[in-house]
């Protein structure tokens, strides 16, 4: 497992900001955030268990709570407490579970494109991706991903870099049983009950043009949390930290400081 800690540019600042990725699980998802947020915080990013090409197989009953326990262990091993947290989709739910399991470890939460319960539309998207992986192969699974993550115009304008990233992802693809175990754990997770118990100040951000998660699900999650605010962005797609990085960074920072 890879854990990366980037010191704050201001050495007097020790507050840590933790970033947790979505279904892909890789730390490099947050590359557009590193330089900006290390002006204000120490930043921790990590590869989630099972996402490397040479990863051991995950257990057959792998659950979202296992991902939360993994992050708790990372924070404790690095002597970190009272961190701010930013999580994307699956990563957002890791934050919810950590806030429930070990509330003292987190201070403020930012949840990007989460849901209160799995929408039928999102389930159809997940089932389609699973079918591609099981019946067509790794290449089709990886190359379809952009359709769910990014707006059409962004895909058109970034064809070369996107193709390069896809080719690298195919070569470095995780064991297929791990990808399916992680997807099934996300499909099975019910965040609504846990969210209602989380008392941390929370910002939920959804995107109106998200082609994977209807933004109304983010609003519903916000309404189920005692201390949450909701921000709806007009554009950016599901991965707006990539496509609208500057706007997202400013929105997140304004909430955290």
Residue ranges: model-predicted function:
Residues 236-245, 249:
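Catalytic histidine-centered segment of alpha/beta-hydrolase-like enzymes
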Residues 5-57:
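Conserved HGGG/HGGXW glycine-rich cap/lid loop of the alpha/beta-hydrolase fold
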Residues 198, 204-206, 210:
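Short beta-strand/loop motif that positions the catalytic acidic residue
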Residues 100, 107-136:
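Flexible "cap/lid" loop of the alpha/beta hydrolase fold
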